[in-house]
A protein has these predicted regions:
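Active-site mouth loops of central-metabolism enzymes
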Residues: 57-75, 117-125, 166-171
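Short, acidic/polar
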Residues: 71-84, 124-131, 172-178
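Conserved beta-strand positions in the central sheet of alpha/beta enzyme cores
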Residues: 91-92, 142, 168
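Active-site-adjacent beta->alpha loops and helix N-cap segments on the catalytic face
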Residues: 96-114, 122-131, 143-160, 175-179
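Conserved, mostly hydrophobic/aromatic
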Residues: 8, 58, 83, 91, ...
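Glycine-rich, proline-tolerant flexible connector loops at the mouths of alpha/beta enzymes
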Residues: 27-36, 65-70, 89-110
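N-terminal amphipathic alpha-helix/helix-capping segment at the start of soluble metabolic enzymes
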Residues: 1-61, 66
Length: 182
């Protein structure tokens, strides 16, 4: 892992342990059971492929470690509306709080206003996070192979599928791509 990714993962481990002290898995499962706003991310893309249309996944993020703050007056709903008005296929919402200044709440806010599938873009290292993302309305997750080992990636992938979520796997090297395709 590179230096910034190491920092993000270490912070993410701390954050997850803190959240688990206050939020039970059963509470998340109850919230998921009551939510009917889930949309099929993968199906939306496949429908475009079948109809020979391009699929655009539009990213919503406030900041990044490399770029700093991108939007001073960041309004995820306003950005999502602009993308929706321009007929994007799906949305990718960056939810990592410390380095990208995101929030899972942004997914919930967007899903209440816009009927597009939403990918939760975060640093997934624990299945608990998948339940969190789903409880806020995420339809898909991103697994970044550079941040976790292959066994954990497979566990996260299977957990997301159990929750009827789509999964996008991000690789940064040829070796990671080969592992992802196993």
């Amino acid at each position: 892992m590179n230096n910034i990714l190491d920092k993000i993962i270490r912070k993410k481990i701390e954050k997850i342990e803190e959240v688990k002290k206050n939020v039970s898995l059963d509470l998340l499962k109850d919230k998921i059971a009551k939510n009917d706003s889930f949309l099929n991310f993968k199906e939306k893309i496949f429908n475009n492929v079948k109809n020979n249309k391009i699929s655009i996944i539009a990213e919503i993020k406030k900041a990044s470690p490399s770029a700093g703050i991108i939007f001073n007056d960041y309004d995820p709903i306003k950005i999502a509306n602009i993308y929706n008005d321009n007929k994007v296929t799906c949305l990718s919402v960056l939810t990592e709080e410390d380095f990208f200044l995101g929030s899972l709440k942004h997914i919930d806010q967007i899903k209440k206003k816009i009927k597009l599938p939403v990918l939760c873009k975060d640093f997934f290292i624990d299945p608990f996070q998948i339940y969190q993302a789903k409880s806020y309305g995420a339809d898909a997750i991103l697994i970044i192979l550079a941040g976790i080992n292959n066994d954990n990636a497979q566990k996260l992938y299977n957990e997301a599928l159990k929750l009827n979520m789509s999964v996008i796997v991000e690789v940064h090297t040829v070796e990671e791509a080969k592992e992802a395709l196993k």
